Amino acid sequence: HIPEITKLKLTEDEFYEKMEMLIRWYETKCFEGKIRYYGIAFEFMVEEPFENKWHIEIERIKNIARKVSGEKNHFKYILFEYNIMCDWADTVKSQMIDGVEMTMIEACKALELETVASMPFAMGDGFKKYALSDMLDFVLKKMNHVIVGSKNPKHIEEILRCWRGNLSECSGRQRFSGTDLVEIAKCNNVSKRTIYRYKAYYEEMKEAESEK
């Protein structure tokens, strides 16, 4: 999470050596069956093209994963902020793939990495200028996944209600908070795996609350 900060304190070689150690650890956990995939969450890099202090080459990281576990490695996801007010990942060329400058989204596609959007509603600021449908369309056209902001079990309950197709409570609101699921417009097409994942998350949160 936010490897750019770690990179500030290291040389280029030191940073990628530590990345290899980390990737070896994650690949081990995948082979042990404890996790299925892993990825990286960026904070600053997508907005600064080839800025040395932040710059990280995802192609180099992908190649490290290939070195560790071959083409069947489990390095799969790249997360970054992406919304209608923050489109750097689709407009700023911050990556170099096979000698070609690309945006982060283009680079992920070229490397067969799945993209995950954080802050799809710009932490709520997007509602001051844009309609929900416009923000949904903007994000879903480019990204593979959208992260869900959820701080308590009630948020998870609301998400599951929407997934079941019961939008009466949600659709009646004039404003949506950042905790609402971006895929709400596609609630009838959500995969069972996704629903099960959030059901499990909900149960964990309920259990944690009961222990307080």
Question: What is each stretch, according to the model?
Answer:
Residues 2-170, 175:
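Beta/alpha (TIM)-barrel catalytic core signal, keyed to glycine-rich beta->alpha loops juxtaposed to Asp/Glu
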Residues 197-212:
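Short, solvent-exposed alpha-helical "recognition" segments
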